Design a protein with these regions (language model features):
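Alpha-helical interface subdomain recognition
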Residues: 2-89, 108-113, 120, 124-125, ...
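A generic local secondary-structure boundary/capping motif
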Residues: 117-119, 135-136, 145-146, 157-161, ...
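A short core secondary-structure module
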Residues: 131, 156-193
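Cytochrome P450 C-terminal beta-domain/meander region
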Residues: 140-154, 305
């Protein structure tokens, strides 16, 4: 009798697809390129009106349990929203607050900490950030200079995504005589905290330099467990950001295809030229591979499966490469016009570059991936 292996379905449900359609319609109206450019060219660090609208839609509480004011849908629904937010280039602190700060509280927070912050997050009344980096080098337990002692934390964190607009920060710091890493909650509106905006390639995602000088801090999670918690947190965020990147890459491909079909040269659509065809085909293949890896990551995240570390790293690497390729080739297909400020091509190029760095570069995640694969094979 022939062996019939069990089928695995990574597709989203009908309700989740309806959520995608609802989100796409809402963001098409509320996060147009005109709105994105308003943040890019203006002084506001994010679109506060859009942020309030997302709160009213219930998106901010998608993965937050009902007892803490959330909708308690789950991470698959959050992945659906992330893809649409990436497609629309939504200029909000969603990633820092939902993928990082809220997830940190859900993973390690006490009931009191969750009750203090999660309802505010779900309502859109609080913004969070994750303060891990201490400069351009890769943060490790051995090179942490930020220190925590006696309920106080001191050090410099830079760059911190949405650190200039956050109400609280989840800070990675060395603690105790042994200097083991721990996570700490810091009210960044309190004393001992100085924040300075940091310019990046994509001003629609604000960053800051945060100086902590004996700032009040409370432990998040068990003492000395900060590094394993940070790794878990980054894995979860990597899957969600991968969906943003896939959404952005698809938007860049759609933009390139539409232009190629509407632009004529020598009496023909430029989409009929082999060089353009191959660029579009390569973009499509890269995006579909990245999407498949992101779907696998979504499954692992929703189940908190043992495969999550490998699935997250795979999704991260594929999405970084696909989005950068799509954003770059979109500019090339547009020709000289693609390099101008007036065309929207550079908006995706900026976002592709930034999302490719904000959780650590694709190169770092490749190193993580091979390390994890080798550990699994041992």
């Amino acid at each position: 009798m022939p062996y019939d292996p069990p089928a695995m379905n990574f597709d989203f449900s009908g309700d989740q697809k309806s959520l995608r359609e609802q989100a796409r319609k809402f963001l098409a109206e509320q996060s147009s390129s005109t709105r994105v450019r308003r943040i890019l060219e203006g002084a506001a660090p994010f679109d506060a009106e859009l942020w309030r609208g997302m709160g009213e839609m219930g998106w901010l509480g998608t993965a937050i349990p009902e007892p803490y004011g959330g909708a308690d849908f789950g991470h698959l629904e959050l992945c659906v929203l992330a893809e649409e937010l990436g497609r629309s280039l939504a200029p909000t602190p969603f990633a820092s607050t939902i993928y990082l700060a809220a997830e940190a509280l859900l993973l390690a927070g006490t009931d009191a900490q969750k009750k203090r912050w999660l309802p505010k997050i779900a309502q859109g009344a609080a913004i969070g950030c994750f303060a891990m980096a201490e400069g351009p080098h890769v943060a490790t337990p051995a090179n942490l200079t930020t220190r925590a002692e006696g309920g106080r934390v001191s050090g410099v964190k830079v760059p911190v995504l949405d650190g200039d607009v956050a109400d609280f920060a989840v800070v990675l710091a060395a603690e105790g005589a042994g200097g083991r890493a721990g996570l700490f909650l810091v009210d960044v509106n309190g004393t001992g905290v100085t924040r300075t905006p940091v310019a990046t390639v994509d001003p629609t995602r604000s960053h800051a330099r945060i100086v902590l000088e004996n700032a009040a801090a409370e432990p998040l999670g068990l003492p000395g467990q900060g590094w394993p918690l940070a790794e878990r947190l980054l894995d979860r965020a990597a899957v969600l950001v991968a969906f943003e990147q896939v959404g952005g890459a698809q938007a860049a491909l759609d933009m390139a295809r539409e232009y190629a079909l509407g632009r004529f040269a020598f009496g023909r659509q430029i989409a009929s030229f082999q060089a353009i065809k191959h660029k579009l085909a390569d973009m499509y293949v890269a995006i579909e591979l990245a999407r498949s890896n992101a779907y696998y990551g979504a499954w692992a995240l929703s189940k908190d499966a043992p495969e999550l570390p490998v699935a997250a790293a795979t999704a991260r690497v594929g999405a970084c490469e696909a989005y950068y390729q799509a954003a770059k080739e979109n500019i090339q297909i547009h020709g000289g016009m693609g390099f101008t400020w007036e065309f929207d091509c550079h908006l995706h190029y900026r976002r592709a570059k930034l999302t490719g760095l904000m959780l650590g570069s694709a190169r770092r995640w490749k190193d993580l991936l091979i390390t994890r694969l080798e550990a699994g094979a041992a």
